[in-house]
Amino acid sequence: MNTLRSMSISRRLWLILVVAVAMLVVLGLLMLRQIHGDLYQAKAEKTRHVVQTAAGVLAYYQGLEAAGTLSREAAQQQALQVVRALRYDHDDYFWINDLGPKMIMHPANPKLDDQDLSAIRDPDGFAVFNEMVALARQQDAGPVNYRWPKPGASEPVAKTSYIQLFKPWGWIIGSGVYVDDVQAEFARQLRDASLVGVGIALLMALVVMLIARSIARPLQEAVQAMGNIASGESDLTRRLDTHGSDEITHLGEHFNRFNGKLQGVVGQLQGAAHALAQSAGHVGDNAGAAQQRSAQQSLQMDQVATAVNEVTYAVQDVAKTAEQAAGEMRTAQQQVTHGQQAIHGSLAQIDRLSLTIDEAVQVIRDLAGHSTRIGGVLDVIRSIAEQTNLLALNAAIEAARAGEQGRGFAVVADEVRLLAQRTAQSTAEIHTMIEHLQSQSDAAVKAIDTSSEASRQTVEQAREAGASLDAINQVLNNLTALNASIASATLQQSHVVEEINRNVLDTAGLSQQTADAARQSSDAGVALGRLSEELEQLLRQFRV
């Protein structure tokens, strides 16, 4: 099967012709062999029949002898005359010999009459008449094949004879035919059969050629069309001939339908590939723009993170400053306490003013010195309040920049700024009071020498100074509480800002990831564009 599949269909069809011709030749040879045998058999049968007929002549005359009509000699002579005259097929004759063997009568060669035949042999050394006698003795009748020259010729040719023993007279009657005419007849029939066989072979060759052409040519066209598609020519507009109703026509119809469907599919794929290329271009452009926007967003988030870090540092500075202010306030409170103690001491000294003016003057001078120092402390407090106000303003600005997450911090910053403003106002009032105290102390120093009334007024002023110091002490206590609140709020704000900073850093990381994803999308868009171009190039191979 695989060997046949390695041959083309046309060759296989011609192989059928070769096998058919070979079988025809074999059949012809067998038939010729049969004909050859039949010709020989026909000759032999014909000879047997004519010999049996001639033997009937002998039986007739022997019957006359038996009836007493003729003597044996007369009956034999008449029988010999009749048999001598018998002919068939123009020149064929009968002879008679006895069991001697001795020739009784030979019409074609009278010289053999009364001759001893035992020494006669054919060119092959075959003792013809001895074999005839032996056959007659054994079977009474039968064929004998040998070679014998034709009448008037010296060259022996093949001959077949049939002999029959006529027992009443002891004669053997026989007749033979030359088989060279059988060979001629066989050659004629061989020639006729060969001509018929050649004619049949030529007719079969013509039929096979027409059939092979009707099969191979459409198949070659189909194979060529398939090969063109497979090799890259890809002409999808090609159609095969579909005239007919055989399997090859059905194959062509199926191929045409397949090519038509493939043509439609490839056409749709070309349109889809073109649309895909355009979409890939749009995707690449959008991805590139998204990448740029993501990069800008990442840069802005880095800037926001930097600003938040600065705010964190500023808040930490505010916390430190608030802590320092609290320390300064504690120092001021201690100083106010000392001032109160000094005022009380001054009151005691004023009560003893009548005892010693010098001690009162000294006390007043001490009071003036303390007032001066308190003024310095108040300057520091005023400076701290101004810085706190400035820091609160900056914190409010940064909180406003932080948006919704910094709204609470903005409220706290506004409260701190208001507290700082009130602290500054109170400090200014205290400073004014200190200045007034100093002026009164100076007036008391000047007036202490002139009038006890002045001393009383000084005592009164000292009491007022004590009350003022109490008020200052209360204010300082309030400032200390406010500073503690500011420090606590600043600490909380620091935690909030740190949380904002972490969120901003996380957002910056997400922005970077978004930028990376946008870059990957851009790369994917470029790769998709290349793939769509390759697909378009592949589809351009098909002509639709």
Swiss-Prot record:
UniProt xrefs under Gene3D superfamilies: Methyl-accepting chemotaxis protein, PAS domain
Disruption phenotype: Deletion of the gene does not alter motility but largely reduces chemotaxis to acetate, pyruvate, propionate, and L-lactate.
Pfam annotation, one family: HAMP
Highest taxon of source: Bacteria
Parts of the chain that traverse the membrane: 12-32, 50-70, 192-212
Membrane topology, record value: Multi-pass membrane protein
GO molecular function: transmembrane signaling receptor activity
Domain Methyl-accepting transducer: 272-508
Keywords of this entry: Cell membrane, Chemotaxis, Membrane, Methylation, Transducer, Transmembrane, Transmembrane helix
Transmembrane is among the record's keywords: yes
UniProt domain HAMP: residue ranges: 213-267
SUPFAM superfamilies, alphabetized: Methyl-accepting chemotaxis protein (MCP) signaling domain
CC per GO annotation: plasma membrane
GO biological process, one term: signal transduction
Keyword field contains Transmembrane: yes
Compartments where located: Cell membrane
Stated role: Chemotactic-signal transducers respond to changes in the concentration of attractants and repellents in the environment, transduce a signal from the outside to the inside of the cell, and facilitate sensory adaptation through the variation of the level of methylation. McpP is a chemoreceptor that responds specifically to some C2 and C3 carboxylic acids. Recognizes acetate, pyruvate, propionate, and L-lactate.
Family to which the UniProt record says this protein belongs: Belongs to the methyl-accepting chemotaxis (MCP) protein family.
Protein name from the UniProt record: Methyl-accepting chemotaxis protein McpP
